[in-house]
């Protein structure tokens, strides 16, 4: 498979590792921070940190917005679903995040809360249209790159005159986190590793 099999070419990996070792000044320590949990997963899955010279260090950054979400936000979402009888729509990766009192959205669903896993904010809007007698709340989460779909669904709801749809907005901004890390951390990275999804 293109761009998968290439990762398994041992000769190419050894050549690249040797080039990195040759370029890295042994008198200097290099610190790179991967920002997103997806980056961390790729580095670990393919063993990339194991081939780096000892003076080239990867620092795990803030991670995923789901993992950074304050417990109180999950508690608030559960309260909406359990006590206000709303249809709470969320992405699958939020379902098992631990919340207060040993709860999670998954456990709240097991207790009778109407929590639905969706793939797109538009799925939540369609649920609202199909259930006009119920309030449908989209539990919006993600880095700032996920805010446009949230904005689009709100605009679509307004244009369609849907009155039983709302958003519990929990988007996370990356610049504040990076600024804090770059200013305050003793082991701060020289280079944060960003991509087109997260970062400039």
Annotated model-derived regions:
Residues 87, 135-137, 191:
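Structural motif
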Residues 170-200:
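Catalytic alpha/beta core domains of metabolic enzymes, predominantly
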Residues 1-133, 147, 155-160, 166-168, ...:
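Metallocofactor- and cofactor-centric catalytic cores in central/energy metabolism, strongly enriched
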């Amino acid at each position: 498979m293109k761009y998968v099999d290439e990762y398994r070419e041992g000769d190419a990996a050894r050549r690249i590792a040797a080039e990195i070792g040759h370029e890295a000044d042994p008198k200097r320590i290099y610190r790179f921070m991967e920002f997103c949990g997806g980056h961390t997963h790729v580095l670990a899955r393919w063993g990339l940190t194991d081939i780096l010279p000892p003076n080239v260090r990867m620092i795990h950054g803030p991670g995923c917005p789901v993992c950074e979400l304050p417990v109180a936000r999950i508690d608030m979402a559960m309260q909406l679903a359990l006590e206000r009888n709303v249809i709470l729509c969320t992405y699958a990766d939020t379902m098992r995040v631990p919340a207060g009192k040993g709860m999670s959205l998954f456990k709240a669903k097991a207790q009778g809360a109407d929590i639905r896993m969706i793939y797109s904010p538009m799925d939540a809007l369609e649920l609202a249209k199909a259930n006009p007698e119920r309030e449908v709340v989209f539990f919006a989460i993600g880095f700032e790159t996920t805010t446009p779909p949230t904005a689009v669904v709100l605009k679509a709801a307004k244009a369609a005159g849907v009155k039983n749809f709302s958003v519990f907005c929990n988007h996370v901004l990356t610049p504040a986190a990076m600024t804090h890390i770059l200013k305050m951390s003793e082991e701060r990275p020289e280079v944060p590793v960003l991509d087109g999804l997260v970062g400039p």
